[in-house]
Amino acid sequence: MNVQPIKQRFGIIGSSPGLDRAISNVAQVAPTDLSVLIQGESGSGKEVLPQVLHAYSARKHGPYIAVNCGAIPEGTIDSELFGHEKGSFTGAHEARKGYFEVANGGTIFLDEVGELPLTTQVRLLRVLETGEFIRVGSSKAQKTNVRVVAATNVQMLQAVAKGTFREDLYYRLNTVPIHVPPLRERKEDIHLLFRFFAQEAAARYKAPPLTLTEEAQRMLIAYRWPGNIRQLRNLVEQMSVIEQTREVDVKTLRDYLPEESTALVPASAGGGIESISERELIYKFLYDMKSDLNALKEQVRSLVAGQPMPAATMPPVYREELYI
């Protein structure tokens, strides 16, 4: 399948086989009404694929709503998704439609679906199975006709095994699985993306675009990119503002690549967790803290191994349950 028109329409940069396969799979499943689960690391560019799916579906003239499940507090997520009746909780001064009601006839994209509370997962499963939902504070079931597309950076089978994600919901969402490859598996795309981001920054800051020496190109390609495309974009943005010399060499690049020595690996190295240094894992989560705070909290939960900790000894992020 020729995916070039799709990439041009949605501004998707790259030509790696893994990326083209993901786009092709999305385009093929778009005309159906099947649920789709998009899996990939944080920052790998999952967010554009639901837009492609909606645009090439029979629902393209209906609403498209994207919801970041990890950014909504647990106490209000049911209200956000399914709506509420007046007086159903403190502050509910009037009835309000939820996203599933607003998206009727269209597509709803549930990003970070792995962060949904178990109680909300039960409600979502009902929507997928019957097309029905109940507003918070109501006993009346309402119908909705939406297509659900979900995305996650969580290893879902592990989440199912741990009991943090319902097995029946996982298989209901995973009717058509789509895998978005991380940037380290798209080596042929790295320089293309660098040039694209450099041109963007040049136009924004009215300065010549950054270029790379050949050695710097090789370093960029060999780097593991734990923060994926988001990290590369931020790196180009920083250098575009700070660096006076527009040709970036290895010495300059090294200043912007954290832990280069642990990030540079042979091309034949495995991609398993055992091949990533502890420092790099910490960086991966801290780097995306603002958008992936729930992933950081999950790491803390793993560290305490499910054992209760006194609030005073908990890390501040875990203790305060921040939502950004």
Model-derived features: positions:
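Nucleotide-binding/hydrolysis machinery
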Residues: 2-20, 57-62, 137-147, 155-301
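Conserved post-Walker A coupling segment in P-loop NTPases
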Residues: 11, 18, 24-93, 101-117, ...
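Protein kinase-like catalytic domain
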Residues: 30, 117, 128-129, 240-243
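CheY-like receiver
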Residues: 79-81, 90-93, 97, 117-120, ...
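AAA+/SF3 P-loop NTPase mechanochemical coupling elements
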Residues: 95-105, 117-123, 136-153, 165-166, ...
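The feature captures the ABC ATPase H-loop/switch
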Residues: 113, 130-131, 153-156
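Terminal-proximal interaction/regulatory segments of ATP-powered molecular machines
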Residues: 304-324
